[in-house]
Regions:
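Cleavable N-terminal export/targeting peptides
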Residues: 1-33
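Short loop/turn motifs that connect adjacent beta-strands in outer-membrane beta-barrel proteins
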Residues: 25-36, 71-84, 98-100, 116-121, ...
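Transmembrane beta-barrel strands of outer-membrane/channel proteins
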Residues: 36-46, 88-92, 124-130, 166-170
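Sequence/structural signature of outer-membrane beta-barrel proteins
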Residues: 45-51, 74, 91-97, 130-137, ...
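Surface-exposed strand-loop-strand hairpins of Gram-negative outer-membrane beta-barrel proteins
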Residues: 46-62
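Outer-membrane beta-barrel "beta-signal"
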Residues: 63-65, 183-196
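Residue-level signature of outer-membrane beta-barrel architecture
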Residues: 69, 112-114, 154-156, 194-196
Length: 196
């Protein structure tokens, strides 16, 4: 039975949207007055057999250095006032199950932060990138895969430079049909971090 092209179309459309949102724009539309920042995040993730075509339970401890570049500052008004930024992440994950191993990657994520409240600022984000898995996970046809993810976060301001970050992410890893088998890992990740 032939595979439906729908997942590939959705993935391509998603990355096209991220690319368009990351393009530079005329400076008269928005000014970049906020400073860029670094953050260090860590957390726990787990895939769920039966969620989509996922068949393996994979558990990870994630360490994520992140660079946050402000693209558009002071957009919108009212409850949706905020800014658009791009996250560049370099995740390293310790795989705990089904075997002890690691995976590494690079993520390019577009984000929108709502700034109505000065102390608590929710944000949404999405994107993806390549990921290399050192573990032999049944159902994964290749070591080099791609990921896409989206999530929600909450930023709490400790002071001008240091902010606490709390995130939930849906995280998908697969080889996009480049090899068989291609059983994806659909995971939830709970992440906390701090900016500096």
């Amino acid at each position: 039975m032939a595979k439906s092209p729908t997942p590939n179309i959705l993935i391509c459309s998603f990355f096209f949207l991220i690319a368009v949102l990351s393009l530079p724009v005329d400076q008269t539309l928005a000014t970049d007055t906020r400073p860029d920042s670094w953050a260090f995040l860590g957390g726990y993730g787990q895939s769920y057999p039966g969620w989509g075509q996922t068949t393996q339970r994979v558990e990870t401890i994630d360490l994520i250095p992140r660079y946050n570049h402000i693209v558009f500052d002071e957009m919108g008004s009212g409850w949706y006032k905020g800014f658009h930024s791009t996250f560049f992440e370099f995740p390293v994950s310790l795989i705990l199950n089904p075997e002890i191993s690691t995976m590494i990657g690079i993520n390019f994520l577009a984000a929108y932060t709502f700034t109505v409240n000065e102390k608590w600022q929710p944000y949404i984000f999405g994107g993806g990138g390549p990921v290399y898995i050192f573990a032999d996970i049944p159902g994964m046809g290749t070591k080099l895969n791609g990921n896409y993810q989206f999530g929600i976060g909450l930023e709490y301001f400790l002071n001008k430079q240091n902010h606490l970050l709390f995130e939930y992410r849906y995280h998908h890893i697969s080889n996009a049909g480049t090899a068989e088998p291609n059983e994806p890992l659909n995971s939830s990740k709970f992440i906390i971090g701090i900016t500096f």
